[in-house]
Amino acid sequence: VIILPANMATKIVKIEKNLESIQVAKAGDNVVLHFENNIDISRGDSVVLYHELPTESTQINSWISWLDNTPLQVGKTYLLQHRFKNVRVKIQEVNQKWNINDWEFTNETEIKLNDIAQISLRTNQPLFYDAFDKNPKSGNAILIDETSNNTVGALMFL
């Protein structure tokens, strides 16, 4: 396995659940992992199979569902919460907007309450993520307005 974001390779030598050794754990299980070389990991770190590494990037394309009365502002910095990690992001552009009335895509760039659009954003530090259609649990995030602390968008990474 690989531990991210430290990018350290190791092997799992023991899995414990309720103080008992088990052979298999699934996502969401509360377990203790013992690693071959005694690596210390923290909340928010990921343990992934070496052949299933997520994308690591500061440039992300995503679908967004806008949840706030104040329209999305291109160029504005927001807080992106992905799993247990928060990073600052800047909205770079609106690539296309989905018109839910006729199911067509438009080049309209104003994104208001309940609009759905494809956007490009840039994070202030690398983010490890999957495309939503590959792994919904690590392919989603929320966008938070830093001033109001309101959740303003729901994201599905492409």
For each predicted feature, which ranges?
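C-terminal effector/interaction modules appended to NTPase cores
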Residues: 1-158
